[in-house]
A protein has these predicted regions:
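Histidine-rich, glycine-flanked metal-binding segment
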Residues: 1-39
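Divalent metal-coordination and catalytic microenvironments
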Residues: 8, 13, 35, 46, ...
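Histidine/acidic residue-rich metal-binding segments in metalloenzymes
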Residues: 114-132, 136-310
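C-terminal cap of metal-dependent C-N hydrolases
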Residues: 323, 327, 383-449
Length: 458
């Protein structure tokens, strides 16, 4: 967790020792973190990049933004329409190499029956987490795929997440103890509600929330949980992404009571800070931001340990593309967030007495590393672990601007917000990649792909 009154000795990219006194220690550099918090490097488990620009370019800007925000490892949510074998995943890995400031890993989205056969191969190359998009089906079946390296024309794919395909993913993933990430929404319900809303001529974030109701999430959570309990693997590890409503939380808690499978909950910073009364289309996201009472529920769940991790669902697009024709229906879903994850948790959480700094370390690093097979390499400050550290000044105030965050995106839902509590140094495997908001250009390429074996979850 958090280190206090201790000196951290780093050698060959690893933590060598934790010592009380460093007066007799010789080192090439000594960093004084007196009065600051030293956290295990933050891990963002939910990042989209490579969709609007090829990964060889997107990795450069978005891993730079990660470093600004104290994130030392980012996990890409990869969507390929073709098979992952046949060197398609190999091309993505090759294009990623040398283009990251921070370490990175990959979740594989399984979108078609043919890709189920790739699950054992994915595990062999260190990808042990699979994504199910329950929201894709009916006539809501189109989604942007990740671009091939060097390609720039946006690529759509048609996906029908049938019960048969979902069951196949859960069964095959559970047999090899993969973590199965779930986007839980019922596309039939959402499609019907969207049609009604358009016929009634309504617009805005409240309309978007109405069209993708929390009970749609709850239904889908119950459905996939039943598949998990009945899986041939003897139970599943289900990780519910971007949970932001009280109804979804209640559904997961109800499934936890039934046992057999393991259930993990991820929320995102925007579900802790924004409601559907926010007056701009830039906050369109799926599932939608909800009500004030939902925001309060998410903080309570975070404080009480019901929420296991915080991820950002970061998407790097430009404002002109984001807003579409200026209405909620043509606007793109998703926005940047990787650089503001820690500042939001520190400012709105720790400094406003909603959560402790220990909770921040747990939900941004320790839990994430354990769930996704990176512990004890990541997620902890102990001898033998990677020297991934985030030094935080809990009293540092900054006004958020897009330029401050150094992403490809030219907007942020936190534009103009004064946040107190910022990372002042991001250390990736012993290398200070960011200091006082400045990212070292020489650190480009330092980030490495992190293969992940079966997770240590207990």
């Amino acid at each position: 967790g958090i280190v206090s009154d201790t000196n951290i000795m780093i050698e060959d990219e690893k933590i060598k020792a934790l010592v009380r006194s460093a007066s007799n220690v010789s080192a090439s550099r000594k960093i004084d973190a007196t009065g600051k918090y030293v956290l295990p490097g933050a891990i963002d488990p939910h990042v989209h990049y490579g969709v609007y620009r090829p990964v060889n370019e997107a990795a450069r800007t978005e891993s730079r933004s990660a470093a600004v925000g104290g994130v030392t490892t980012m996990i890409r949510m990869l969507r390929l329409y073709d098979r992952y074998c046949d060197n398609n995943i190999g091309k993505q890995l090759q294009a990623s190499r040398g283009n990251h400031y921070v370490d990175y890993s990959i979740h594989a989205s399984i979108l078609r029956p043919e890709q189920v056969r790739d699950i054992p191969y994915l595990r062999e190359i260190g990808i042990n987490s699979l994504k199910i998009y329950m929201n894709l089906g009916s006539d809501l079946n189109r989604i942007h795929m990740d671009l091939a390296p060097g390609a720039y024309e946006l690529k759509d794919g048609v996906v029908q997440m049938t019960d048969e395909l979902m069951s196949s993913i859960v069964n095959n993933g559970s047999r090899i103890h993969s973590t199965i990430l779930v986007h839980a929404e019922n596309p039939v319900i959402c499609s019907e509600q969207i049609l009604k809303a358009k016929q009634n001529g309504v617009d805005g974030l409240e309309a978007w929330s109405y069209c993708r109701p929390p009970y749609s999430e709850a239904q889908s959570i119950a459905k996939v949980s039943d598949l998990g309990r009945r899986s041939s693997g003897g139970g599943s590890y289900l990780y519910f992404v971007h949970i932001g409503s009280n109804a979804a939380l209640d559904a997961i808690l109800a499934e936890r009571q039934k046992g057999r499978s393991n259930y993990y909950v991820e929320t995102c910073p925007h579900y802790l800070t924004h409601t559907n009364e926010f007056g701009s289309l830039i906050a369109k996201v799926t599932p939608p931001i909800r009500s004030k009472s939902d925001v309060q529920s998410m903080w309570s769940a975070l404080r009480n340990g019901i929420v296991d991790t915080v991820g950002t669902d970061h998407v790097a697009n430009r404002l002109e593309m984001k807003v579409g024709k200026g209405d909620i229906w043509s606007a793109l879903s998703g926005f940047p967030g990787i650089a503001t994850m820690l500042p939001v948790l520190l400012s709105k959480g720790v400094n406003e007495n909603r959560i402790s700094i220990e909770t921040v370390a747990r939900v941004t690093s320790y839990n994430t590393a354990r769930i996704f097979g990176m512990y004890p390499k990541k997620g902890t400050i102990q001898p033998g672990s990677d020297a991934d550290l985030t030094i935080v000044d809990i009293d540092l105030e900054k006004i958020v601007t897009p330029d401050l965050l150094q992403s490809y995106s030219d907007y942020t839902i936190y534009d103009g917000w004064r946040l107190r509590g910022w990372p002042i140094m991001t250390i990736v495997r012993g290398n200070p990649v960011m200091e006082d908001g400045e990212v070292a250009n020489a650190a480009l390429g330092h980030g490495e792909f992190i293969p992940r074996p079966v997770a240590i979850r207990d």
